[in-house]
């Protein structure tokens, strides 16, 4: 009489994450369309390998490549069922994950993938695309050398000028904070020149005109503001308090208070609620 062997595997939140990443957003299909696997690539495709890795990152809160292979091996039957094909732990070895990361670092792969992912996310979740917030951040590293491309010393927001860092320009839909663009640049790159590059990319992903771009005073550079207006969009940014601007600002406010200029009411979207006056 044949015996039945029962295998227990912990599924945790893996099916839920796969439903979102694979079934709803189809990240694996998008990457495989943009960067089809080489003929000698066996097992999980590049896109499926990426989604498996993303699932590990989100489920385990761990981005280390070396941990993914053992993690998949613990649930091999689950992964075979989810992907509909045999899944080997070697399909997600650190060598393969490194190749995924290398491919994603190529602009000819990353930029169209980011565009398609954003468009699909906006469509699936019916996100409002009216306001985009732009900002930069830095991440310090304890390695790197003089020949490093990304890891450079620059103005440190972590107050650690002795450490090398990389810089990231991020674009997110307001008010949800949904990320729609990311550029990774060397840590000594000035912020000013990153805004136009990001906005130009977003114009092929989001509506090209009619958006409000929001940023800090570094977005207030004249060239950036001119580009936003020239492309049919609006901007909201504080002007940097440098040069003669503080004195000019005092005069502008004084003129408004003394009634020397004509003030126009600013109304909320309902057309009735007054938000203030300006000129």
Give short role names for the model-derived ranges.
Residues 180, 205, 230-233, 239:
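Compositional signal for N-terminal targeting/processing segments
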Residues 1-152, 162, 169-188, 196:
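Dynamic "connector" segments at or just before major functional cores
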Residues 193-210:
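Short, basic/hydrophobic alpha-helical segments
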Residues 146-155, 186, 199, 222, ...:
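Short secondary-structure boundary/capping segments
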Residues 190, 212-223, 241-244:
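Acidic, metal-coordinating catalytic cores used for nucleic-acid/nucleotide bond scission
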Residues 57, 211-212:
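Feature marking long nucleic-acid-engaging regions of large polymerase/nuclease enzymes
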């Amino acid at each position: 009489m044949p015996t039945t062997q029962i295998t227990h595997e912990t599924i945790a939140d893996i099916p839920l994450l796969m439903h979102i990443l694979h079934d709803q957003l189809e990240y694996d299909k998008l990457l495989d369309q943009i960067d089809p696997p080489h003929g000698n690539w066996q097992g999980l495709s590049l896109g499926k390998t990426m989604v498996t890795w993303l699932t590990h990152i989100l489920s385990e809160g761990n981005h280390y490549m070396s941990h993914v292979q053992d993690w998949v091996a613990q649930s091999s039957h689950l992964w075979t069922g989810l992907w509909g094909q045999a899944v080997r732990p070697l399909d997600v070895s650190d060598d393969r994950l490194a190749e995924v990361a290398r491919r994603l670092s190529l602009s000819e792969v990353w930029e169209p993938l980011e565009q398609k992912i954003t468009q699909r996310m906006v469509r699936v979740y019916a996100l409002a695309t009216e306001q985009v917030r732009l900002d930069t951040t830095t991440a310090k590293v304890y390695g790197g050398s003089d020949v490093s491309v990304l890891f450079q010393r620059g103005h440190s927001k972590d107050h650690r000028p002795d450490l090398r860092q990389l810089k990231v320009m991020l674009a997110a839909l307001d008010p949800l904070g949904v990320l729609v663009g990311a550029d990774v640049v060397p840590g000594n790159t000035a912020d000013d020149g990153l805004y136009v590059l990001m906005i130009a990319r977003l114009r092929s992903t989001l509506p090209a005109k009619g958006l409000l771009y929001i940023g800090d005073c570094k977005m207030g550079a004249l060239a950036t503001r001119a580009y936003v207006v020239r492309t049919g969009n609006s901007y909201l940014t504080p002007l940097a308090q440098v040069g003669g601007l503080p004195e000019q600002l005092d005069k502008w406010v004084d003129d408004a208070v003394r009634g020397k200029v004509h003030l126009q009411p600013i109304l909320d979207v309902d057309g009735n609620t007054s938000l203030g006056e300006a000129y």
